[in-house]
């Protein structure tokens, strides 16, 4: 059991200024999805300097996972911390971004820059997810600095691709892989054997063992191409041969279906509340420079959140029924991306939740509460571990505009949690030397 003495000793070993500098330095390394190499190299080198024996394990040389280890000096449980190296941002391909972002959004410096202003850390890379990553790195350093050895192993992992992308349509192949080469790849090929896992992400110091998945569906409307001079317009747009004219009818139906689906999809368990959401994310139809005869096909792309109990087939059937009822003509519904949601078994994850609660009570003076439903209503990489029967939660500091103290508090909670889960061991219990000869090999 961790004590106030442990809390005070570890807190004294956490340098808030060092933690802030680490988060800012790491956050200011450009690391969009697909371009995580430089940030990964930085984390690897930091772990090496601090003595955490890092390794690189990746599906490609440019997008590797970094795995460091602290502890493993005796008999104890293993706790894995993970955070992602990539951060959401425009593609920076002007031919793509022009169809998604306004000029003002593209000019937002927080996509790729981080700084301290009025006591708050600004910049999306710190919020998601290199601030929490810095917290568990400093947590491991503080344990070591304060003289706490761990019986079990504390894995420190930094992954690419948690945000994405996803291979869809012509944007396919290895270059567009996301989650498949991050924590998924780490679990299968990273040489880790965790008893528990924490996805370190901003949760406002709450926790949840619930995670949503998602599916992206392509809803395709078919029609007829008509030479423009021969076109005769019907009275109703829904009867037009050009399927683009029927998009309005379909989006009205999708909007009504969305409200019903979201209400029916709310999910609550002891581990959290999931409120999965639905949103149209793209539309494609026709070839702008090849005009003159309209188009025969238009596609809408619909993102559908999935709670831990929902399956993609359920959504497929519901969307097909919706489109038939709407009378939109010939249509096709097909999932182009599928990732189910997961939750931890309440009994199996209880020791981890209890450790986080004890650490939070010592560090912050109050209990660790279930996180806001928004943090249970998205994909986070605790899903990967719960999928594979490793009890996992996501928990971490203030999500939006964290203060340096928030990061320091989170580092303390992570360190105390690791001490509770992994157990104590004397640092001197590590293996001595590596020579092939003992001290007195020949008895002289």
Q: What residue ranges belong to the model's regions?
A:
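N-terminal helical capping/dimerization or prosegment-like subdomains
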Residues: 2-102, 299-301, 315
């Amino acid at each position: 059991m961790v004590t106030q003495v442990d809390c005070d000793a570890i807190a004294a070993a956490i340098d808030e200024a060092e933690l802030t500098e680490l988060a800012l330095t790491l956050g200011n390394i450009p690391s969009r999805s697909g371009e995580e190499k430089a940030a990964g190299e930085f984390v690897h080198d930091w772990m090496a300097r601090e003595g955490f024996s890092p390794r690189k394990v990746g599906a490609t040389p440019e997008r590797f996972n970094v795995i460091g280890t602290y502890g493993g000096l005796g008999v104890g449980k293993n706790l894995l911390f993970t955070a992602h190296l990539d951060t959401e941002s425009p593609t920076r391909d002007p031919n793509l971004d022009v169809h998604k972002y306004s000029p003002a959004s593209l000019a937002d410096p927080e996509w790729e820059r981080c700084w301290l202003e009025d006591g708050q850390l600004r910049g999306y890379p710190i919020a998601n997810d290199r601030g929490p990553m810095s917290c568990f790195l400093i947590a491991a350093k503080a344990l070591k600095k304060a003289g706490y050895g761990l019986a079990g192993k504390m894995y420190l992992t930094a992954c690419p691709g948690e945000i994405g992308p996803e291979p869809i349509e012509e944007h396919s192949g290895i270059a567009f892989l996301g989650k498949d080469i991050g924590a998924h790849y780490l679990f299968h090929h990273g040489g880790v054997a965790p008893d528990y896992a924490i996805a370190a992400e901003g949760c406002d110091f709450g926790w949840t063992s619930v995670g949503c998945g998602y599916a992206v569906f392509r809803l395709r409307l078919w029609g007829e191409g008509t030479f423009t001079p021969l076109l005769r317009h019907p009275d109703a747009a829904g009867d037009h041969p050009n399927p683009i004219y029927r998009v309005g009818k379909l989006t009205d139906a999708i909007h009504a279906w969305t409200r019903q689906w979201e209400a029916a999809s709310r999910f609550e368990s002891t581990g959290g509340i999931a409120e999965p959401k639905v949103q149209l994310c793209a539309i494609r139809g026709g070839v702008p420079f090849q005009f003159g005869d309209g188009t025969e096909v238009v596609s809408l792309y619909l993102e559908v959140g999935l709670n831990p109990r929902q399956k993609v087939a359920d959504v497929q059937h519901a969307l097909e029924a919706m489109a038939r009822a709407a009378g939109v003509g010939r249509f096709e519904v097909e999932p182009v991306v599928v990732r189910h949601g997961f939750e931890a078994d309440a009994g199996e994850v209880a020791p981890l939740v209890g450790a986080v609660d004890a650490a939070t009570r010592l560090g912050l003076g109050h209990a660790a509460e279930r996180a806001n439903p928004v943090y249970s209503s998205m994909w986070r990489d605790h899903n990967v571990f719960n999928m594979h029967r490793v009890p996992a939660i996501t928990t971490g500091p203030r999500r939006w505009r964290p203060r340096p103290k928030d990061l320091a508090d989170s580092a303390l909670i992570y360190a105390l949690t690791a001490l509770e889960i992994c157990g104590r061991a004397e640092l001197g219990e590590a293996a001595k030397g590596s020579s092939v000869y003992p001290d007195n090999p020949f008895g002289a």
